[in-house]
Every structure is written in C-alpha cells, then in structure tokens.
Amino acid sequence: MSKTIVLSVGEATRTLTEIQSTADRQIFEEKVGPLVGRLRLTASLRQNGAKTAYRVNLKLDQADVVDCSTSVCGELPKVRYTQVWSHDVTIVANSTEASRKSLYDLTKSLVATSQVEDLVVNLVPLGR
C-alpha cells in the first residue's frame, strides 16, 4: 500500500502518493486532476558530516507542460516540474523528542502568522 499525504486548503483536498522512497528521501506526487498544476513533494532528512545536526528539506514542485514541437525534445509535450516552495529546518542531533516537538510547534505557529503570510503572498518584509 502506497503512503499518501492529504493536503486540505480551504474547500480543496489534494492527495499526494509516494512514488519513490530511500532511507533519506521520499517523493510524493499528485496522481489525479489536470496534469498542469499537479504537485510533487520531495522530503529529505540528512545528517551533517560531523553528525551533530540533521537537515530536513521539504520542496514542493508544480507540473507544467513543455511544448516540444519547436525544440529538441521531440514531438510530444513533456511534463516539467518547477519548484514553487521549499522549507529547510536544521535540528541538533542530540536534541530530545520534546524539544523537536516544540521546534515543530513553533515553526507551524510562525508560518501561520499574518506577517509570514504577507511576506510570502505580498512580498512584504517582516515588520513593515
């Protein structure tokens, strides 16, 4: 059974299904709906060289179709994913589960603020 992630935004629900998984990286893609606009999420968890910290990276890409009739990629259109969002978190390796949960809660709270929404949506620097 494939793993899935369900994203609920307003009235819409979008389901991403795991298509690839390794020890430190998973890729989830949207499999239903129009091809243009489908989402792909890449999640990775890697330890730094000194093994003192972990880096969590989430990257969201959105599908578009490239017209190949006028280029060298052949006759048929091809799907191209373009990064539309990413989020990086660094976690101290010897942290406790409680401190990591607190970091997660703080991150979730920060991203939900109107100031961060204004920064992301309207490109208004924080504090202005």
UniProtKB/Swiss-Prot annotation:
Membrane-spanning intervals of the chain: none
UniProt name for this protein: Capsid protein
CC annotations in GO: T=3 icosahedral viral capsid
Gene Ontology MF: a single term: RNA binding
Keywords: Capsid protein, Disulfide bond, RNA-binding, T=3 icosahedral capsid protein, Translation regulation, Virion
Main location group: virion
A Pfam family matched in the record: Phage_coat
Subcellular location: Virion
Signal peptide: none
Function: Capsid protein self-assembles to form an icosahedral capsid with a T=3 symmetry, about 26 nm in diameter, and consisting of 89 capsid proteins dimers (178 capsid proteins). Involved in viral genome encapsidation through the interaction between a capsid protein dimer and the multiple packaging signals present in the RNA genome.
Binding partners and assembly: Homodimer. The dimers in the capsid are covalently linked with disulfide bridges. The homodimers binds to the viral RNA via an operator hairpin, but also to many other RNA sequences in the viral genome; this interaction probably shifts the virus from the replicative to the assembly phase and ensures specific encapsidation of the viral genome.
Similarity field: Belongs to the Leviviricetes capsid protein family.
Outcome following mutation: residue 53 to L/P: Loss of translational repressor activity
Listed GO biological process terms: regulation of translation
Highest taxon above the source species: Viruses
Matching InterPro entries: Phage_PP7_CP (IPR015148), Phage_RNA-type_capsid (IPR015954)
UniProt entry tagged with the keyword RNA-binding: yes
Annotated RNA binding sites: 40, 46, 53, 55, 59, 61, 84, 86, 90
Species in which this protein is naturally found: Pseudomonas phage PP7
Phenotype for residue 55 to E/F/H/L/T: Loss of translational repressor activity
Keyword Disulfide bond carried by entry: yes
